[in-house]
């Protein structure tokens, strides 16, 4: 079976070899753990964002930069293609580990989740558990983790602290923005899973999403980065299903436009909800447009729509 952490460790080695070139900085903590700053106290950039995206997906996807057109304005975008959608996106990339220790908080994603089984139910559903001596984690946080955080992660992953490798970037950084848009395929798979679809039927995934500019603090950037997927993210999946009628119904329910909160920038929705995630419709976290091709029935279905106007409003780009 593929080890996402072994693949992640190979990427870490590459990052350490090229850290000056890609504007990142590593340090080894007293307990031996390696922390790689990709945007907290360093500049980072598109190269750092690409490395974070590769880490999150455990190098089980082809990732490239491209552009999308937003009402005549070309903006940077990221394109993902994978033949290992459940392992790459759900066993690794999905930000399913909420790490809160003392006054430190960060969302954990990437290979280490496959050791800690975060969350356990998901790994049981897809039938995956990694076995590796090293844990590789990507943290979305504005602070670098301490020895205490490393000990917590090492314990949950059953590895020694010196075998913990963590790459970190805040949402309000170029690298952070890139790796969030790189979740476009994963976001669609997660939405399909949440409405009851058997994601083990998904055999490949492809997606494109714009990359948000830095619009403010982490909370505001969380809004614009989510909007990239919600309003302009496009995904295409190949499945082995066979029940075309049922599949058509799932495709209808999958896009973000089915959410009651759809239609305005996410930051506005979040603010109106008193910055309480539990008051925001979870169904909103989905790509704008989803297409599925079924290899068994030979049928294809598409649903959703692109909304560049809302994304431009979220970006706040002034035409001068």
Swiss-Prot record:
Say if the entry is tagged with keyword Hydrolase. Answer: yes
**Which GO terms are recorded in the biological process aspect for this UniProt protein?**
methanogenesis, from carbon dioxide; one-carbon metabolic process
CDD domains with a match to the protein in the record = MCH
Please name one Pfam family that this protein belongs to. MCH
Entry EC no(s)? 3.5.4.27
Q: Does the keyword Acyltransferase apply?
A: no
Signal peptide positions (record): none
Which key words are in the record? Cytoplasm, Hydrolase, One-carbon metabolism
Q: Identify the domain of life.
A: Archaea
Enzyme type, top EC level: hydrolase
Matching SUPFAM superfamilies: Methenyltetrahydromethanopterin cyclohydrolase
| Localization of this protein | Cytoplasm
One GO cellular component this record assigns the protein to is:
cytoplasm
Reactions it catalyzes: 5,10-methenyl-5,6,7,8-tetrahydromethanopterin + H2O = N(5)-formyl-5,6,7,8-tetrahydromethanopterin + H(+)
Q: Which GO molecular function annotations are given, in alphabetical order?
A: methenyltetrahydromethanopterin cyclohydrolase activity
The protein's role, per its UniProt record: Catalyzes the hydrolysis of methenyl-H(4)MPT(+) to 5-formyl-H(4)MPT.
| Family the entry assigns | Belongs to the MCH family.
Protein name per the record: Methenyltetrahydromethanopterin cyclohydrolase
Organism of origin is Methanococcoides burtonii (strain DSM 6242 / NBRC 107633 / OCM 468 / ACE-M)
């Amino acid at each position: 079976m593929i080890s996402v952490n072994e693949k992640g460790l190979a990427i870490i080695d590459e990052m350490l070899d090229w850290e000056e070139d890609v504007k990142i900085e590593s340090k080894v903590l007293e307990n031996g753990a390696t922390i790689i700053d990709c945007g907290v106290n360093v500049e980072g950039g598109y190269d750092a964002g690409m490395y974070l995206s590769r880490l999150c997906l455990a190098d089980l996807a082809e990732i490239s930069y491209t552009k999308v057109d937003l009402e005549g304005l070309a903006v940077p975008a990221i394109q993902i293609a994978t033949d290992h959608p459940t392992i790459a996106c759900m066993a690794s990339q999905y930000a399913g580990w909420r790490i809160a220790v003392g006054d430190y908080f960060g969302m954990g994603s990437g290979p280490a989740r496959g050791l800690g089984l975060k969350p356990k139910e998901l790994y049981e559903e897809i039938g995956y558990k990694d076995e590796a001596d090293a844990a590789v984690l990507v943290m979305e946080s504005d602070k670098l983790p301490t020895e205490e955080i490393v000990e917590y992660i090492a314990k949950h992953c059953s590895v020694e602290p010196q075998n913990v490798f963590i790459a970190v970037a805040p949402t309000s950084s170029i690298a952070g923005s890139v790796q969030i848009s790189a979740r476009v395929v994963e976001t669609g798979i997660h939405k399909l899973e949440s409405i009851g679809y058997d994601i083990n039927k998904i055999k490949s995934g492809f997606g494109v999403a714009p990359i948000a500019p830095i619009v403010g603090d982490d909370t505001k950037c969380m809004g614009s980065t989510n909007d990239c997927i919600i309003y302009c993210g496009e995904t295409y999946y190949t499945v082995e299903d066979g029940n075309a009628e049922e599949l058509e119904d799932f495709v209808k329910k999958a896009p973000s436009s089915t959410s009651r909160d759809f239609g305005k920038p996410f930051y506005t929705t979040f603010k109106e909800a008193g910055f309480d995630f539990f008051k925001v419709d979870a169904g909103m976290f989905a790509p704008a447009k989803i297409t599925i091709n079924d290899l068994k029935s030979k049928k294809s279905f598409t649903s959703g729509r692109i909304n560049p106007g809302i994304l431009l409003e979220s970006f706040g780009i002034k035409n001068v």
